[in-house]
């Protein structure tokens, strides 16, 4: 597991289009931030969104901060984490 460093950005994306979220992630990466935090409490599915954002960035790491254990079975959480880790090269 990689260490999550300082210099991250926490944001909500529920009002953004997918293209706007990609542009934001690319800008955050360009500015040198290490991590983009996306909450699960409102808006879009963070795991699906992270897959799209990871495909359009090269070094930016992603975190949910909160993943609601009452809405997601632990096995499904593991599947999502494993899939995203593979798709993003461990980011």
Predicted regions and their residues:
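Structural motif corresponding to the early beta-alpha repeats
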Residues: 63-76
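N-terminal beta1-alpha1-beta2 module of alpha/beta enzyme domains
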Residues: 1-64
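Flexible, glycine-rich active-site loops centered on histidine and acidic residues
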Residues: 2-16, 73-91
């Amino acid at each position: 597991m990689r260490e999550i460093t300082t210099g991250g950005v926490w944001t909500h994306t529920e009002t953004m289009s997918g293209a706007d979220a990609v542009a934001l992630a690319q800008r955050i990466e360009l500015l040198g931030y290490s991590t983009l935090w996306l909450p699960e409490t409102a808006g879009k599915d963070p795991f699906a969104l992270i897959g799209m954002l990871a495909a359009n960035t090269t070094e930016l790491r992603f975190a949910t901060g909160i993943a609601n254990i009452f809405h997601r079975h632990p096995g499904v959480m593991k599947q999502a984490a494993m899939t995203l880790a593979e798709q993003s090269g461990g980011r």
